[in-house]
Amino acid sequence: MVSKASRDQLRKYGAVSLASLLVAASIVAYRWWNAAPSIEVEKKLRRSVSRCVVVTQGIQNEDMIHDLLFEDTVMLLAPGCTAEGRLKSASRENAYKVISCTTWQSVWACVRHFRKHTLLVRTSEVPSGVPADIGGYVSDISDI
């Protein structure tokens, strides 16, 4: 038989061993999870910027447009742009993000309404240029 003092000492060693094991496992798990961002985190970081893209005739056939449709992006089809059917069929679940505008005034009205972080537009294809007040509705205007 084991004496009471020996049992108490075994319990203490067991408790200390268990605590040490838990601390070591916690440290390993913490370092493993924080070593590199996961794919989901990278996607969230990439998506964190909302965009509004004015699709004109010159850029309607570029692959970049199709890739942006899956992110937090609204596609505004400028007057004369014929890519509506192709963009909507590329991703039926994101078809609601493709908006066809009949006038340039309606394009700028949509940009003002959506207030996205970034506006992507090919300024050389905009007949009267980007209106001066658009900078108050978006944080960044990028010429593509």
From Swiss-Prot:
Keywords: Membrane, Peroxisome, Peroxisome biogenesis, Transmembrane, Transmembrane helix. GO terms for biological process: peroxisome organization. One of its GO terms (cellular component) is peroxisomal membrane. Pfam families: Peroxin-22 (PF12827). It is a single-pass membrane protein. The chain crosses the membrane at residues 13-35. It is found in: Peroxisome membrane. It comes from the Eukaryota. Involved in peroxisome biogenesis. Belongs to the peroxin-22 family. This is Peroxisome assembly protein 22.
